[in-house]
Amino acid sequence: ADEGHKLRNKDTARTGRFLRYLAQHNARFFTWSGTLFGSSVKHGAHLSAFALREGSPFPLDPDVVDEWSAAIDPSDNPAPLGPLQRLLVATGEGEIERALHVRIVESPGVVSTKEGAIDASILIDERAVTVPAGINEALTNLRKTWVRPDGEELVDALELARVAREMAAGFYYRWIFPKGEPDSLIEAWFQARKAWHKEVREKLKRREPHLDSPLLLAKAAARYHLGEPSDLPTWASDSYLDWIEIRDSVYHESEAVWIDDYLARDAAKWACENRGIVWYQHGAFGQRVAELAGIPLHGGGIGAEDRILAERGDRSIVASIKSHGTGRDGLQRFFSEQLVSNPPSSGSDWEQLLGRLHRIGQPRDEVVTLAYRHTPEYADAIDNAIKQARWVQGVGGNLQKLCTASVIFLTP
């Protein structure tokens, strides 16, 4: 399995089905990736178990894997090492990450290299930008009150972080209801939707065959409640009937509300003055940059790969991290500069993103990457990614681009 990192999350339907296939067919398994571990030993343990079986450097018992994860994964409050202290003694290492690295690379069947495939260097620096007073004020109010500028109250920390990152880019998303449904109906719709999604999340934790994705669960609930004939399993969902009764009675759209497009204007300015790629995570932001700069926007959809690979490097482009930031080969032949306008917080996402230009076929001696880190949310995202990359390099031994790059803003 090439791109083994796509199978590292056991909670996805894809990985669940793949692991069931391996278990049912007793297949021999090989995999490789530069970002296999992500940010947890749990990301590689199940794949190692199928590939190496009793020779795996990780525990075969999932409960013990969880214990290792709590003690070894990057965390401000790791669990005590407990029995893992013996690994420090056995390897002669002083840090548990290094001890685990020795255990992994010395296990028969594991191939690890520290050699890079490209001689070009990487330079990462901050692109400074002045934050308008209106953005600073809006972000301060958001952090204090957990209320969006339009009065919407946020309910959890993940939602708060998402909105703060949007507002740092100058806007936020909201749902609108253009058909004018009554507020009481919209509220009932929200409650039914919330109950259904919560029940689905709980059910998915068990990852049962034919019940391992939201779509399959909806079909199983329909078979139970509506009596649809099938040999497939059913699911006696408590919330399904309430949800389907009201599901189609409310129509909503996402709308971007701009506070100040200062960051999009700055990214467009960079794109016009240089020849490179502006990477984005938020669709509204990417669209605004492309419009301001008068350059192509490369998102997803049918034909997306052909369209972006048809570029010849005679102009800057705006590209989606989700659609083109992983696995896309060919951009390195035409570009050596990039601006990460909405920086990811995942070390593995950065590894893949930097690898779009820093790879075999890059004719320049240096790949230059600029990134915004003008708010705590943006700075924390990059700092967290660097922390994860250091952990992955320490445990897995694979050189991480965030670690080998010259990161200017970290220089004292």
What name fits each language-model region?
Residues D2-E3:
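Walker B catalytic acidic pair
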Residues R8-G34, S39, R53-K203, E273:
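Inter-lobe coupling linker of SF2 helicases/translocases
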Residues H25, L292-A293, F334-F335:
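Short, structured coil segments at secondary-structure junctions
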Residues F29, G276, V367-T369:
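Hydrophobic/aromatic residues located in beta-strands of well-ordered beta-sheets
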Residues S33-G44, Y280-R288, G303-E311, R315-D365:
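SF2 helicase motor core recognition
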Residues H43-D61, F335-V340:
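A short helix-turn-beta junction within AAA+ P-loop NTPase domains corresponding to the substrate/partner-engaging
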Residues I118-I135, R143-D329, Q400-P412:
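Conserved Helicase C-terminal RecA-like lobe
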Residues S345-P412:
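A conserved SF2-helicase RecA2
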